[in-house]
Amino acid sequence: TTTAYMVRSILEKSGFKTGLIGTIETIIGDKVIKASNTTPESYIVQQYFREMVDAGCDSVVMEVSSQGLMLHRVSGFTFDYGIFTNLEPDHIGPNEHKDFDDYARCKAMLFKQCRHGIFNGDDPHLDRMLEGHTCDVETCGNRHSGQVQLL
């Protein structure tokens, strides 16, 4: 969520009119809609995209949850960029993922649906996220793990 707001802020400051779909809210121009799911149902996402175009948005930042991927809420979408920050066992349980492997597999699905992937090279689960990816890969990190070194 924090990353989504940071990326949106960077895009806005760079002159892009940017919509947001995320855990807390959806922002369409001046309109703010409280979120009920991080990744809404696909027909709602399509409705939001249409409203964003009508509001003059030229970019969208969207949080895509493992649940959203697992439930095919973004099936058929091609994202320009996908960002992997980290993977922690916080979505395991009867209402989400049966185990960590299922959670990781669902998260990694994003990188079969984007053109460019930006990955945290310091995360111990990086290899799992790269399994089966079809996107260009860029890594960043604090250690010697990334193509881009963070200072």
Give the predicted meaning of each segment.
Residues T1-E25, K31-V32:
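Walker A (P-loop) phosphate-binding motif
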Residues Q46-R50, L71, A108:
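Short hydrophobic/charged patches on amphipathic alpha-helices used for structural packing
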Residues D54-A55, D80-L151:
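Acidic, Mg2+-coordinating active-site environments of NTP-dependent enzymes
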Residues E25-I33, I83-D90:
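Acidic/polar active-site rim loop that often engages polyanionic ligands
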Residues S65-G68, D123-P124:
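Short beta->alpha connector loops
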Residues V32-S65:
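Conserved nucleotide-sensing/catalytic segment adjacent to the nucleotide-binding pocket
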Residues T18-G22, V60-V64, I118-N120, T139:
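General beta-strand structural signal in soluble alpha/beta enzymes
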Residues G68-S75:
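Conserved helix/coil segment N-terminal to the catalytic DExD/H
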